[in-house]
Amino acid sequence: MNPIMIQAVNDDGQSIGEIEKIAAHENEGTWHRAISVFLFDAEGRLLIQQRSEAKYHFAGLWANSCCSHPTVDETIEHAAHRAMLHELGVYSNVKELAVVRYEATDPVTGHTEREHDHILIGVLTEEPNFNPSEVQAIRWVSLNGLRIEIEQQPEKFAPWLPIILKQVSFSS
């Protein structure tokens, strides 16, 4: 399998080159570009996924609808569409809502996220057909219910989810 090359970034989020995806998460991590997609249904509920146990970091934790890293020649929107199709088997128009920078280390694997994370939102009108190599479960939740759940059981959630929910307003 060919290595996946993603976009390394500086403190301002400007591309400064490329780095292999796994290498970007090793040791203390390297700042890199990422996307986090938040898909809502017509009732305003958010689709969240439980990450597969096969993931190389933060396996088995609940996260937003899907995440990925734009490859070196890929736009943010294309990366979002690729991730939605690969992880959830769906397509939705998305728009960028915000950018969040965060760092988080997986206590199990030692892999570190240092992400300049583009937050995208969309409305999903079809039923997801998730890829079990990426996702082990999905569910629809209200944002308020999700915030309460994260407060009560933070260990069940990927660390970027509460960070994004605190920094980004999802109200229409």
Predicted regions: what they are:
Residues A34-C66:
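A glycine-rich, hydrophobic loop/mini-helix early in the fold
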Residues V37, C66, E96, H118-L120:
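A structural signal for short, well-ordered beta-strand segments
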Residues L47-I48, A63-L97:
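The catalytic Nudix box helix
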Residues M1-S36, F40-A42:
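Acidic, metal-coordinating catalytic segment for phosphate/diphosphate chemistry
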Residues T30, K55, A59, V72-D73, ...:
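Hydrophobic alpha-helical segments and helix-packing faces
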Residues A23, G60, V72, R101-P107, ...:
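Nudix hydrolase/Nudix homology domain
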